[in-house]
């Protein structure tokens, strides 16, 4: 057994498929729950209002209107759902 073989044994198992299994990618439960909550009817409606406001504001060259209220409504609806579901997914 040569020096190169010993290094290979110390640094890797030699089987790429086995290494991939060992390195499972962790998924943030917050991201998953947020995506699920964004599909609910209340969040979909709030997002639609936000997108309409964004189009309206973007189409004007001069306006004092912003979409702060619509953004906060959407985030409130989504985060209300997330707060209810998130802790059920934690281990």
Swiss-Prot record:
Residues 17-27 have a biased composition (Acidic residues). Disulfide bonds join 37-81, 53-67. Residues 1-30 are annotated as: Disordered. GO terms for biological process: mitochondrial electron transport, ubiquinol to cytochrome c. Residues 1-13 form a transit peptide. It is a peripheral membrane protein. This is Cytochrome b-c1 complex subunit 6, mitochondrial. It comes from Macaca fascicularis (Crab-eating macaque).
């Amino acid at each position: 057994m040569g020096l190169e073989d010993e290094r290979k044994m110390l640094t890797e198992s030699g089987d790429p498929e086995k290494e991939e299994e060992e390195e499972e990618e962790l998924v943030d439960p917050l991201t998953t729950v947020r995506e699920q909550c964004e599909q609910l009817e209340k969040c979909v409606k709030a997002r639609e209002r936000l997108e309409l406001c964004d189009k309206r504001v973007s189409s004007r060259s001069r306006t004092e209107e912003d979409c702060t209220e619509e953004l906060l409504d959407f985030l409130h609806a989504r985060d209300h759902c997330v707060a209810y579901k998130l802790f059920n997914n934690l281990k």
